[in-house]
Amino acid sequence: MVPVPVHHMADELLRNGPDTVI
């Protein structure tokens, strides 16, 4: 996973679900 801001990761979680962020 590429290091990105936490708020970006949270946004991805809201849009796509946990599996996308990993």
From Swiss-Prot:
It comes from the Eukaryota. This is Brain peptide MVPVPVHHMADELLRNGPDTVI.
